[in-house]
Amino acid sequence: MTFLELVRKRCSVRQYSDRTVEPEKMNYVLEAARLAPSAVNKQPWHMLLVESEEKRQLLQSCYNREWFKQAPLYLIVCGDHTESWKRADGKDHLDIDVAILTEHLCLAAAEQGLGTCWVCNFDAPRVKELFALPEHIEPIVLLPLGYPADESVFEGEKKRKTLTEIYAHH
């Protein structure tokens, strides 16, 4: 699969099967994330894998959507404010770095036939409390992960702006 084929395959999956994600596939996805670049190579991130039914229910209470409850696994992708690089004007690159890591997770998952969906509209203070995250660690993305209920979801055409709408040459 070429890179463009992979990028075309990756999509937001909101229906999951109950099929178990093999540990070797999960390790592959995590290794792809580990290799993600970051500003000044600070790597200001932490990931929590949520797998037990008890912890899954706790996390589901932070984003109460029926489709979200179907996923067999979740990653809580967090940023570490003490580790992130700040530009001279004060711009913190934490969200950018975590976004790069998260998309590495999503692309590696898609390559392995797994579905994901970025979730940022969740109760972050509740996640922080329920998972006992230290003050300097911010939960930024919830990433449900599992096999799609319908594998044809990977074949759909993406609705995207044309290149001329987003690109200029000077």
What kind of feature is each model-predicted range?
Residues P72-I76, T116-C117, I140-V141:
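Structural motif
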Residues L114-R126:
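GST superfamily/GST-like fold recognition
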Residues K25, L30-E31, L35-L101:
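Glycine/small-residue-rich phosphate/adenosyl-binding loop
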Residues G79, N121-F122, Y147:
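Short secondary-structure boundary segments
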Residues V127-I140:
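Short, electropositive alpha-helical surface patch
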Residues F3-V13, S17-T20, K25, V141-H170:
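C-terminal helix-cap and adjacent tail motif
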